[in-house]
């Protein structure tokens, strides 16, 4: 996946793209494009963003969809829709020229051994579907969510060992919360 480069999500910083591009160029940062927002709002398309990024020397990462999405859903129709959205997002990321797509691994809202086993099987199905993506995919740590299927660094490490073609995206905030005081 190459070396590490820092980036930021403009919308988390309450910046539109017009303000975010010059800041990213000045600081030598990538922009993390949140695909969910491009599904929900009238925002510039992938090719327009790519052209602006190329003109200013700004690269991109793509945060794959996570709003109302669960790649580990126990409900087959929800999982199928989640998979379809992920594939569309990867096409968007390819057109954007994104260096990587960042993936949340899903939720397990039902804490029962059978439900958790089925959720893990569902996640494995989704990850198999993403085995040959048009851009690298990195799995993100999610310690902040009690309902996260993958909990803790050891579970994430084991998942990445089973799927070495995926990278890892460290979200420092959840990692610090998980470490505790």
Language-model region placement:
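Active-site acidic/histidine proton-transfer and metal-coordination neighborhood
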Residues: 75-167
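N-terminal pre-domain/capping segments
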Residues: 1-88, 94, 167
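Active-site-proximal loop/turn and secondary-structure-junction residues that shape catalytic pockets
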Residues: 12-14, 35-37, 66-68, 105-109, ...
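A short alpha/beta connector and helix-capping loop motif
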Residues: 179-181
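Nucleotide-sugar-dependent glycosyltransferase donor-binding/catalytic pocket residues
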Residues: 43, 149, 177
């Amino acid at each position: 996946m190459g070396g590490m480069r820092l980036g930021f999500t403009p919308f988390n910083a309450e910046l539109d793209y017009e303000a975010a591009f010059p800041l990213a160029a000045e600081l030598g940062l990538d922009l993390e494009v949140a695909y969910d927002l491009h599904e929900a709002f009238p925002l510039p398309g992938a090719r327009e963003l790519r052209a602006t990024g190329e003109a200013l020397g700004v690269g991109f990462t793509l945060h794959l969809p996570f709003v109302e999405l669960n790649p580990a859903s126990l409900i087959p129709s929800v999982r199928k829709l989640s998979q379809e959205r992920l594939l569309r997002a990867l096409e968007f990321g390819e057109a954007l020229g994104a260096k990587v797509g960042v993936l949340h691994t899903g939720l397990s809202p039902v804490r029962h051994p059978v439900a958790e086993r089925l959720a893990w099987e569902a996640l494995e199905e989704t990850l198999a579907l993403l085995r040959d993506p048009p851009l690298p995919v990195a799995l993100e740590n999610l310690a902040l969510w009690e309902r996260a299927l993958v909990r803790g660094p050891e579970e994430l490490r084991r998942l990445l060992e089973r799927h070495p073609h995926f990278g890892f995206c460290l979200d420092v905030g959840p990692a610090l919360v998980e470490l505790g005081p």
